[in-house]
Amino acid sequence: MRRFSCIVGSVFLAMTQAQAELVINGSTISSNATVPVVTSEDYTPNNNFQSCLANLRSQAIAAGVSGATYDRYTQNLTPDYSVIDKLNYQPEFSTPIWDYLSGLVDEERVELGKQKLAQHRDVLNRASQTYGVPPETIVAVWGVESNFGDISGKYPLLQALGTLSCEGRRQSYFRTEFFATMRILQRGDLTEDQLKGSWAGAFGHTQFMPSTYERLAVDFDGDGRRDLVSSTADALASTANFLNKAGWQTGMPWGFEVKVPQGMSIDGEGRRSKH
């Protein structure tokens, strides 16, 4: 999931489930956070991108991408430096959470979620029985991640992830996703045209990152392919599988709204810091 990373063990897990509950229940939580600002003006398109891709070739091969596959998909690859701006202006971290969530959940989306719940009831029930995740939660994640498949992203994954593999923060992370995208293409699971998504590389109905797709996507419609782009059944079941593997426990709350004690510093807090 976008950032399709959700519940137990990470901030993303908690946020996605929080958003999932919001689509169904319409409740909200609060937070404030910012990230350092670096813009695409700091990055000038030049031969460094091709040099970077050439240097990454051996890493890709070590990660299971054939030389032929790598060469095919990088030969004419060009950078998209607009993703550098996106990397540094993520609304989850720069927008107060009340404002962020109010933009994700409104009456129209809740109503559409109810319609999708009824429309896909059979598949959702099967997925729920298989993975132990309520249909309502699966649909809620679907709504938050792509507005039920209507907005799944327009960025070509290879271009976006290739750029992020060579420029900006978290290059090591994005290289992992870049290579995973190539392995998906190498296996023939999806086509290059299908692999369009968010600036960060998330794609499909519920915005899986490529490495998450490799680990947790399932073929639920029985056609022999794990297609999270064109198959609603595969996407919804894969979402349930994701939450199941993340430690989903039906009936347990995703978290609680709290007030930070006066004088308590939250500088440096993150997913690995606990109190």
PLM regions and their residue ranges:
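Short, functionally critical alpha-helical segments immediately adjacent to catalytic or ligand/cofactor-binding
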Residues: 60, 69-81, 132-149, 181-184, ...
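Flexible, glycine-rich surface segments
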Residues: 192-275
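Secretory-pathway/luminal and periplasmic proteins that interact with or process carbohydrate-rich
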Residues: 79-86, 146-155, 167-171, 187-193, ...
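Substrate-binding clefts and substrate-entry loops adjacent to catalytic sites
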Residues: 102-115, 168, 172, 189, ...
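An acidic, Gly/Ser/Thr/Pro-rich helix-cap/linker signature
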Residues: 21-130
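Solvent-exposed, acidic/flexible segments
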Residues: 42-53, 63, 67, 110-121, ...
